[in-house]
Amino acid sequence: MKRTIAALTMVAVASAAENLIFNDDFNTFNLKTWEHELTLAGGGNWEFEWYVNNRSNSYVKDGVLYIKPTMTEDYIGTQALNSGSINIWGMSPAELCTGPQFYGCERSAAGSGNVNNPIRSARLRTVKSFSTKFGRVEVKAQLPKGDWLWPAIWMLPVSNEFGPWPASGEIDIMESRGNAPGYVAGGHDTFGSTLHWGTNYD
């Protein structure tokens, strides 16, 4: 099971010509460009993953960026997964939790009847290194196969200028699922794109 992004290009569209303003062919993994989110928040959807900055979950090889899920149990053990706590508030900037909402910096399975986030993966963003207002985005990607995988490529606002989500907007360039074709909500043979805006989700 793996997610890959082979290339990402951003082109500014002018009236007469297009100018390349951002490109990454992933010959190297530029961690100044690509910031890792560090959170247990599940994207506001109560997703299963724990987003980390670990080369087991995100790395570059032969011009390809790999985003790979791994089992949390292999990292913290069965007992901690089922009845322990995970605290990622961090003691240094490199380890600092980036998403405190939705209990994103600390989770506990102790006595709750729940388990801690069972999957570790990666979520990368350019919020501190690159943003643009207009242009065309081209992404070359191979989508994963596997139940419960949800690859997505989003454009999110740098700041909530018009208010909290969705008021400041969101462009979902691509979202898909790793499930087999025929899955009721769509499989890895389909994808969707969405625009979010307005005063509320409904």
Language model features with spans:
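Sec-dependent signal peptide recognition
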Residues: 1-7
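Hydrophobic h-region of N-terminal signal peptides that target proteins for export
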Residues: 8-17
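GH16 jelly-roll
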Residues: 17-202
